[in-house]
Amino acid sequence: MSKAVLLLTALLLVSCATPASSPAPATRGLGEPEVSVPARAAADAGVKPPASSGLEDPLTSGLPGPQDLKRLDFRNGEPRLPIKLMEGRDVVTFSPRGRMRLRFGGPGDKMLDAPAGSRWTVRVTQGEAAQWSARVQLGEFRFADKAGLAEAQETWRARGLAVRTHTLGSVYGIAGKVIDNRRYLLLGDEALTPAAAAKQQAELLHRYGLRTTLFEEVRKPASAILELKDENDTVVGLAQDRLDAETPDGSGFDVRQVEYGVGYDFHAFEDRSFRGALQFAVDRSGKLAVVNVVGLEDLLKGLVPSEIFARAHPEALKAQAVTARGEVLAKVGIKHLADPYLLCSEQHCAVYRGRTGEAASTTAAVEATRGQALFSQDGRLVDSVYSAVCGGHTEDNDIVWGGPPDPSLRGRPDLLESAPDVPGPSNLKAWLATSDVPAACKLSSFAQPTKFRWEKRFTQGQVDALTQKLGVGAVQGLVLSERGVSGRARLLTVSGTQGATQVRGELNIRRLFGMLNSSMATVEAERDAEGRLTGWLFRGGGWGHGVGMCQTGAIGRAEAGQSYPEILRFYFNGAQVAPIY
């Protein structure tokens, strides 16, 4: 080690040995007054913030932890986003692919330079977990759906539950284009401990068949000292809560043993390479979180191959790149509000493997569509959602997620040729029983017959176990209703020996039965010779929610000669591809 580095090491150890306390998180009181204002104050729908010359950044206001970890940064007009690679770690090893500059969080803002290929280890010490409370989230509404929000408020108040609303998301501009992904959350009014919130969730599921999520509010951010060691296992610096690493030439980093698939049967570790910069931060448990700060285009290069077959037709890959770009922008400021990053690299947000997961074909598609997104005829950024297999007919957004109808997300037959003799979803049994539907997702060379049409059988014992939390006893009846134009259901009535209840929501229905392929399905009771219930048979079509672009159908359309703007115009009701930077 050079004398200069040794001297800097000594200065860092002295300067960072006594860490400064973390700054208190910013607060904004937009809603009803509270005795204790949380880190993320709730906002009443329709109430504007008071005029002030010191209003916080809309993406970072009220968020816990180091505030600039949550900022949407820009370089040359392109957004850069902080993506979680892994968290809950005690130690992480990494190497720069080019010359590296390290910045230590804490007093003095110390820096260190290191050569390409050097190996470094970050270890968390003196970690303290965040203290947080939670409110049960009862519903989510599009920003335009004030009527739906008001109706839900009255419903819950009539049930005896005090509620409040919170405005989530943000309005921000990119190269003159306005991106607005605001929405309303309807929350239980009382801030609860995690255990009490989980108990309230169970009660709501039992009484109303409603599966809820938790809205977390940080009362005290997590903190820790991050210890940096070189390849000789020598401590060269300490950082309070955060350590930044970047390669000025943009060559990026190799990270050892990246954890992925947490909670799934494919949970494992893999050495991976990433473009962009790295941030080592403290997660909510007081452990180490590794965050990749990467430009949106480079993010898509490592993301798109996980969303679609890299061997698919180039026009389908371009369509996927455009929709994925819009989906990422739509999630900014919506997820991971209590974490030191905006998005994660798992199924919860989008699977992202960095440079390791890139493919030449999908990289070419990202580069060919650089900065392009979908805009509706009235100039709005389209919520460019997609699912794997529509089953021959896409679905309306309001059937799947509630809220007002979105003109860009209208369900329609996804047929490549006229088929006047083929029954439609209005005759669902016949539609699902028809094998010769000329659907784009059936005619695609990547067609998945067992997803296009499928059956799922459950024994009576399995159904009773799956519905036990509903409190209806032994199940005697299952009825799917409130269907959309594709036949997808958004209401399930479950009756049993101890009563009946309803499960509302396309995703909630699918989750109840261990993630059914879709809710475009019929359900029939199966009985033995004596008429006793023995099980239940679901017959269905499609894989996923069915709103927006059918990914397998997009491949079929590309193979039939359609360009990516034509494909997107079809699935998003006339939407146009336009550059945002």
Where in this protein do the model-derived segments appear?
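Positively charged n-region of N-terminal signal peptides that target proteins for export
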Residues: 1-5
